[in-house]
Amino acid sequence: WRKVFNEYNPPAFAVAEAWVNPDRQHLYASTEELGQVFNFEFAKKDWIRDDMHLAIEEGLESAERSGSSATWVMSNHDVPRHASRYGLPQVPASSHHQLAKDWLLRDGTTYEENRELGAKRARAAILMELALPGSTYIYQGEELGLPEVADIPWDELEDPTAFNSVREQIEKGRDGCRVPLPWVAADAPKLDDPDDEFGHD
């Protein structure tokens, strides 16, 4: 890949989706390799200051070690959306990821989700993430503060991950963050003249 990337001026880069510890990220992110790696440390952390601070420090150190820019990811299709995760009870970072997966696996019934608190923390997290140096990767719907849909019945799941574990029901999959975006068509569009950029109400 690097040979192809270097044919461009400036050289192109790709982003590795490698769920590895921060001390191994430079192996994928260096300018001699792909150029960047998704930093999933935020996706594994609860809304605890010291845990978030550690994720930032490790992300910056990893970027410096690789000679690449830092990357920041709050959510993706492999973890419940952070607007929901941050509304669950707080636990140490080592078990937060598992708590969120258990909550999803049991249709959102094992722990009470505080949607209002989760939404506030999600907004604060995105603002923090956007203030950090490097590249921010925003998963579809994050910009709207969408929560995870945890109560999709097993017989309606479409993710292959769920199909592969439906008998044991050990992995619900990624459908809860892939539901259609919410839409209300009751209000008419706000353009008087769609060809005039100043024709808004």
Which residues are covered by each model-predicted region?
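Active-site and adjacent substrate-binding regions of carbohydrate-active enzymes
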Residues: 1-201
